[in-house]
Structures are given as structure tokens and as C-alpha cells.
Swiss-Prot record:
Leader sequence residues: 1-22
Pfam families: Agouti (PF05039)
Covalent S-S links between cysteines: 92-107, 99-113, 106-124, 110-131, 115-122
Name the record gives this protein: Agouti-signaling protein
PROSITE patterns, alphabetized: AGOUTI_1, AGOUTI_2
Residue intervals of the Agouti domain: 92-131
Subcellular location: Secreted
Note on domains (UniProt): The presence of a 'disulfide through disulfide knot' structurally defines this protein as a knottin.
Gene Ontology CC: extracellular space
Glycosylation (residues): 38
Chief subcellular location: secreted
Amino acid sequence: MNIFRLLLATLLVSLCFLTAYSHLAEEKPKDDRSLRSNSSVNLLDFPSVSIVALNKKSKKISRKEAEKKRSSKKKASMKNVARPRPPPPTPCVATRNSCKSPAPACCDPCASCQCRFFRSACTCRVLSPRC
């Protein structure tokens, strides 16, 4: 019985090695001419790169420019936030209240009516707080 188990174990191991070997990718050796002609990347196509050392003044100027850009972005975002919102319609539904199809629109301009469970439970929800 032990010889039979040993034979089965060696058969199993050999099958494992055969399956692993069959899944390995085969690489065919290519000559240098075919590699040169088939290569899609040509080193002459790329421009040369020059490395320039920065002095302290240029570093300070670039920091100042970066701060100016940051401040201008903050000012622009402040302008976008300050825009007036349209007034809500007179008969409107508050946020998180029921808004079935015969009900009027939501009061918040950023909110929309979302329905669940085959339109049996509908509520006004704000989708994006940055509206």
C-alpha cells in the first residue's frame, strides 16, 4: 500500500511540474536586426535634456510666483461661492422630506428628488455640497 501511495505522489508531482512548464511563456531568440527594425521607440526621436542648477534668487522667485497663483486661485474660488442662488419656488419641499410625483420641487436648488423601492419612498436629497 505504501508503494502505491508513493507512486501516486510522484505521479501527482510530475503532473504539477508539467502543467507549470506548459504555462511558461516561450521566448524565441531574435537577432539584433529584427530588434532594431521592429522597435517602436527610437532614441533619436526624443530631445536632449539639459540640467540647469537653480540659484537662491530663482528659488525665491518661483516660491513667490507660486504664492501668487495660490492667492489668485483662492480669490477665484471665493468669487464662485459668492454667486447668488435662484429663489426657491413658492410651493416647495424641504430637504429630506417626502417628494412624490404630485409634490412640488425641492426648495434647495442643489437638491433633487430621489426615489427608492420602485418609487414608493421619495425624498429630497442634496447630491453635491459644493453646488
